Amino acid sequence: MSAIDSAAVLAKIKFNADGLVPAIAQQHDTGEVLMMAWMNAESVAETLATGRVCYFSRSRGGLWRKGETSGQQQRLKDFLIDCDGDTILLKVDQDGVACHTGRRTCFYTAARPEGLTEVAKVQVSPDELYKK
């Protein structure tokens, strides 16, 4: 994806009081929902400029370039803003797994009549993923 001028995009986004907006990552060709994370203005601008998805890590208090540690990068295919301007949908090409648990998606726990059920298997050990 070519670099996108971020000024108009940033003007359209309604960041919360902490300067953040939720971002949903979806596999561009299958529609699989991979994860939800937060973005700030700087991470939005970097994502649009580089085509590599960058989030804001609330726990680390800084930019989180997806895949920087694990190698499991997300390449931006499309950047969509919802009707209220307060949520972003990132259509991405995900390298490997998206979840820090080693699963393809972070949405692997299903609420079923019999209780909570894990519906996705670990594909890569987290220890291997992060070389702990």
Swiss-Prot record:
S-S bonds: none
Binding site for Mg(2+): D82, D84, D86
Binding locations of Zn(2+): C83, C99, C106
Cofactor note: Binds 1 Mg(2+) ion per subunit.
Superkingdom, taxonomy of origin: Bacteria
Keyword Ion transport recorded: no
EC number: 3.5.4.19
Cofactor(s) required, per the database record: Mg(2+); Zn(2+)
Compartments where located: Cytoplasm
Catalysed reaction equations from the record: 1-(5-phospho-beta-D-ribosyl)-5'-AMP + H2O = 1-(5-phospho-beta-D-ribosyl)-5-[(5-phospho-beta-D-ribosylamino)methylideneamino]imidazole-4-carboxamide
GO cellular component: cytoplasm
Pathway(s) it belongs to: Amino-acid biosynthesis; L-histidine biosynthesis; L-histidine from 5-phospho-alpha-D-ribose 1-diphosphate: step 3/9
Gene Ontology terms, MF aspect: magnesium ion binding; phosphoribosyl-AMP cyclohydrolase activity; zinc ion binding
BP-aspect Gene Ontology terms: L-histidine biosynthetic process
InterPro entries cross-referenced by the UniProt entry: PRA-CH, PRib_AMP_CycHydrolase_dom, PRib_AMP_CycHydrolase_sf
Alphabetical keyword list: Amino-acid biosynthesis, Cytoplasm, Histidine biosynthesis, Hydrolase, Magnesium, Metal-binding, Zinc
One Pfam family it belongs to: PRA-CH
NCBIfam families, per database record: PRK00051.1 (NF000768)
Family: Belongs to the PRA-CH family.
UniProt subunit comment: Homodimer.
Record function comment: Catalyzes the hydrolysis of the adenine ring of phosphoribosyl-AMP.
Protein name: Phosphoribosyl-AMP cyclohydrolase
Organism: Paramagnetospirillum magneticum (strain ATCC 700264 / AMB-1) (Magnetospirillum magneticum)
Lineage of the species this protein comes from: Bacteria, Pseudomonadati, Pseudomonadota, Alphaproteobacteria, Rhodospirillales
